[in-house]
């Protein structure tokens, strides 16, 4: 079911509470936070099986951040694999089920987000933590 581009744009604007004079306003005239919301909404609108987002709430106020959190969590509930790249541990712990930590270009651990702490992640990030395997 393909929607008309204008209708789809309006749905994204409404759902993500994008502050804009109208859907025909060029993205270049929007604030950074509103551009971020449009980018996430556009990707979700394509109904992907896998969704990769990098720094999905960077530059957003707390209300907009929670709008994005809820949207990404809804995608996970629909069975979409959501891969999130980031460095803000609070965001990663909020959005992720599992966290893969890199140090020096190598995997230093894969941990369950619900049972880890920022301190443990920090140790893995610096190479000081105990290596965790993917099957744990």
For the regions a language model picked out, list residue spans one by one.
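Glycine-rich phosphate-binding loops of nucleotide-dependent enzymes
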Residues: 1-136
């Amino acid at each position: 079911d393909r929607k008309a581009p204008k209708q789809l744009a309006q749905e994204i604007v409404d759902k993500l509470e994008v502050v804009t004079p109208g859907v025909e306003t060029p993205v270049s005239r929007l604030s950074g936070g509103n551009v971020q919301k449009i980018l996430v909404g556009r990707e979700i609108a394509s109904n992907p099986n896998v969704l990769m987002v990098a720094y999905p709430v960077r530059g957003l106020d707390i209300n907009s951040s929670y709008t994005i959190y809820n949207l990404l969590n809804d995608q996970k509930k629909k069975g979409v694999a959501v891969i999130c790249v980031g460095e803000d541990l609070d965001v990663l712990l909020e959005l992720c089920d599992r966290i893969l930590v890199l140090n020096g270009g190598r995997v230093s651990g894969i941990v369950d987000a619900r049972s880890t702490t920022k301190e443990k992640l920090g140790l893995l990030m610096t190479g000081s933590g105990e290596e965790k395997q993917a099957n744990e």
